């Protein structure tokens, strides 16, 4: 009689699943305000609500907009027919996106921004005529984002 040894396979400990990279990826399923807010840590949620209140006081209309499968749903703020900014969840972080034309860029006190705002300017994309800045809204980024919005609102 021949004995065959069978090695037991070692099972790897189960890894926690990473958070989905796109918060709300399905075009047919827009989130509610409560679902969007539920994904934010408490301090970031407070900054987010302060920013939303500021935009509403400026007369901005707020709605959800689908930015595509790589970004998903996010907030779009408009005043009249002009887009002021977008606020999206990107890789689990709250990010504000604002486009500044040359006149608005001239209104920004770039030296007064924190390192977060300066980094956003360094990583900005677009053209000199229309610069797109992505600013993380956790921490001091929310203050920088508000300063950028004030510059955009001041010129038009």
Model-derived features with residue positions:
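Charge-dense, helix-prone N-terminal extensions
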Residues: 2-156
